[in-house]
Amino acid sequence: MSESRAADAHILSVSIVAGPSAGAWLQQIGLSRKQRRLILPRGALSADANHALEQISAIADQGKVDHLVVECDSATPAMAYASLFLSPPLTDIARLATTVLAIRASDLLNLLVRRVASPELGSPCFIAEQLELVDHVVLGGAKDDPDLKLARNISIALNPRAQVSDLSSETAGRLLDNTESMSFDFGAALDGSGWRQLIDGEKRPHNGGNAIASFAYRARRPFHPQRFWTLLQGGLPSVFRAKGFFWLATRMELVGGLNLAGSELHCAAAGQWWAARDDHARQHEMPERTRKEWHEPFGDRRQAIAFMGLDFDADAFKEQLDDCLLTDSEMSAGPGSWATLSDPFPSWTAHSHTHECDHDHEAGDHECCHH
């Protein structure tokens, strides 16, 4: 046992590897000269916190492993496993070092850009959300594969904080041999996705790099439900990722959450606007970031959606979104009149919140959109 291992009192370092190519990448890993490594193949580690604790405790107690590599099953996101390491008792015996998503460049483009469905790859939103939260993205493909450059640029747009590399035995060995100096940062993962940075104003709108364009759409008046619905039903063919929240004129109480990746689009309730809550809740529970966004007479109600697209005219698309907003005459009619507007969106309830947006709708540090 190494001195550093003894100093850590048998704290086990753990890496989580997810994605359609996770198994292929892990097969390339050879023996490590730096540490004793154990790979748990897909489905071997339970996503149930209590069962996972028992499994990892048994491995740690044996004292024969320095580094545990967990391959996610196709139905469980990497963050579901990562969240197990947020608090004791698991943090007393194991430390999450890093998270990895492995996928072929062509598969990523098929899901997000070419919109080619594949049951083996999973849903576009599932893959996009995993990519946005990991530390490392590993792309498969030949070195002369034209898909590699575009897939790399899309990965960086989705997750600016991630290290993007090729799927090779050298990459695997180099990454997993240095876990002693790594520590997965949950806060950075939640705040570091490209869409989140765009909405928060921490990432500048981007144009270039294989014709990728990104921007955050913001407005302080509601969408006409029928016009916005019609725009969305067009499929937004040039957009490969969109996420954020929106305000429908007919729904003054509830936040609309939008989540698009490739051809997959979800719109659902994402909590309640703070402006629709009572004075006591706003005074004592409303987050500071929401207070900074507050504007009378409608409070925190607004549009804030990040869009990323390929070969599309961002300015023209912004005009399309502007056309979905209420006109001056519609605005002057007031909320009573807005309630009678045609609204083809499915009905929402406050309890149908599915974490589709980044809206501070509860007290504390709960964050939407981070599964």
Locate each region found by the language model.
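Glycine-rich P-loop/Walker A and Walker A-like loops and their local beta1-loop-alpha1 context
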Residues: 1-51, 67, 71-72, 77
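Conserved beta-strand segments of the P-loop GTPase G domain that flank and frequently precede/overlap
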Residues: 15-19, 40-41, 69-73, 100-104, ...
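Short, conserved charged micro-motifs
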Residues: 23-26, 145-149, 223-227, 312-319
